[in-house]
């Protein structure tokens, strides 16, 4: 699942294809595990329900550790920190379906390897 949140994720309205920092990370992760990405755009609340109900494996869209969806999905360890509007640091994460521990571990490894590319 993907929620538009530039620069982390942009969604092309015609094709439905996602681009941006997180979309690139997910695409390279999928290539590394020989998986195919199917972008399902939507608001965070709908995606949170979809992942909780088992309809999605992964949710991206500029999620942070303060996102209200931690009861719906397992959040990765933060892979980047950015300044927030209030002057604090926001820690960026992605969401994985609960119980998908192997996927979570592999994604976190990928994010750790790519961390030098993400600011």
Outline where the language-model segments fall.
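Extended ligand-binding regions for polar small-molecule ligands
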Residues: 23-33, 84-119
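Acidic, polar ligand-binding/catalytic clefts
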Residues: 5, 40-101
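Short, glycine/charged-enriched secondary-structure capping and boundary segments
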Residues: 13-16, 73-76, 109
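Short glycine-/acidic-enriched loop or helix-start segments at secondary-structure transitions
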Residues: 10-11, 69-71, 106
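Extracytoplasmic small-molecule ligand-binding "clamshell" domains
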Residues: 1-62
């Amino acid at each position: 699942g993907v929620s538009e949140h530039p620069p982390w994720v942009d969604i092309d309205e015609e094709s439905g294809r996602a681009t941006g920092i997180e979309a690139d990370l997910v695409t390279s992760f999928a290539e590394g595990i020989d998986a195919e990405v199917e972008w399902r755009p939507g608001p965070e609340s709908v995606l949170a329900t979809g992942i909780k109900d088992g309809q999605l494996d992964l949710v991206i869209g500029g999620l942070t550790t303060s996102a209200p969806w931690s009861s719906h999905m397992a959040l990765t360890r933060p892979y980047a920190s950015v300044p927030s509007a209030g002057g604090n640091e926001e820690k960026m994460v992605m969401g994985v379906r609960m119980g998908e521990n192997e996927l979570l571990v592999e994604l976190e490894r990928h994010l750790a390897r790519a961390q030098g590319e993400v600011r």
